[in-house]
Amino acid sequence: MADTTGRIPLWIIGTGAGILVIGLIGIFFYGSYSGLGSSL
Protein backbone atom coordinates (compact mmCIF):
# COMPACT_ATOMS: atom_id res chain seq x y z
CA MET A 1 0.00 0.00 0.00
CA ALA A 2 2.94 2.33 -0.61
CA ASP A 3 1.87 3.45 -4.10
CA THR A 4 -1.01 5.67 -3.01
CA THR A 5 0.13 8.72 -4.94
CA GLY A 6 -2.48 10.45 -7.06
CA ARG A 7 -5.41 8.28 -5.98
CA ILE A 8 -7.31 7.58 -2.79
CA PRO A 9 -6.58 4.05 -1.54
CA LEU A 10 -9.46 1.65 -2.12
CA TRP A 11 -9.56 0.51 1.50
CA ILE A 12 -10.13 4.10 2.64
CA ILE A 13 -13.09 4.39 0.26
CA GLY A 14 -14.46 1.04 1.44
CA THR A 15 -14.07 1.93 5.11
CA GLY A 16 -15.67 5.35 4.64
CA ALA A 17 -18.58 3.91 2.67
CA GLY A 18 -19.11 1.17 5.25
CA ILE A 19 -19.14 3.63 8.15
CA LEU A 20 -21.51 5.92 6.25
CA VAL A 21 -23.93 3.09 5.43
CA ILE A 22 -23.85 1.75 9.00
CA GLY A 23 -24.40 5.27 10.34
CA LEU A 24 -27.36 5.92 8.04
CA ILE A 25 -28.95 2.57 8.92
CA GLY A 26 -28.39 3.22 12.61
CA ILE A 27 -29.93 6.70 12.40
CA PHE A 28 -32.87 5.32 10.41
CA PHE A 29 -33.61 2.55 12.93
CA TYR A 30 -33.05 4.89 15.89
CA GLY A 31 -35.44 7.44 14.39
CA SER A 32 -38.09 4.83 13.61
CA TYR A 33 -37.88 3.37 17.13
CA SER A 34 -37.99 6.86 18.65
CA GLY A 35 -41.08 7.80 16.64
CA LEU A 36 -39.15 10.21 14.39
CA GLY A 37 -39.08 7.88 11.37
CA SER A 38 -42.13 9.56 9.85
CA SER A 39 -40.44 12.97 9.88
CA LEU A 40 -37.43 11.55 8.03
Swiss-Prot record:
GO cellular component terms, semicolon-separated: chloroplast thylakoid membrane; photosystem II reaction center
GO BP field: photosynthesis
Alphabetized InterPro entries for the sequence: PSII_PsbJ (IPR002682), PSII_PsbJ_sf (IPR037267)
Function: One of the components of the core complex of photosystem II (PSII). PSII is a light-driven water:plastoquinone oxidoreductase that uses light energy to abstract electrons from H(2)O, generating O(2) and a proton gradient subsequently used for ATP formation. It consists of a core antenna complex that captures photons, and an electron transfer chain that converts photonic excitation into a charge separation.
Alphabetical keyword list: Chloroplast, Membrane, Photosynthesis, Photosystem II, Plastid, Reaction center, Thylakoid, Transmembrane, Transmembrane helix
Entry protein name: Photosystem II reaction center protein J
Family assignment from sequence similarity: Belongs to the PsbJ family.
Subunit record text: PSII is composed of 1 copy each of membrane proteins PsbA, PsbB, PsbC, PsbD, PsbE, PsbF, PsbH, PsbI, PsbJ, PsbK, PsbL, PsbM, PsbT, PsbX, PsbY, PsbZ, Psb30/Ycf12, at least 3 peripheral proteins of the oxygen-evolving complex and a large number of cofactors. It forms dimeric complexes.
Membrane topology annotation: Single-pass membrane protein
Gene3D superfamilies hit by this protein: 6.10.250.2070
Oxidoreductase as UniProt keyword: no
Transmembrane segments: 8-28
Compartment(s) of residence: Plastid, Chloroplast thylakoid membrane
NCBIfam families linked to this entry: PRK02565.1
Keyword Nuclease: no
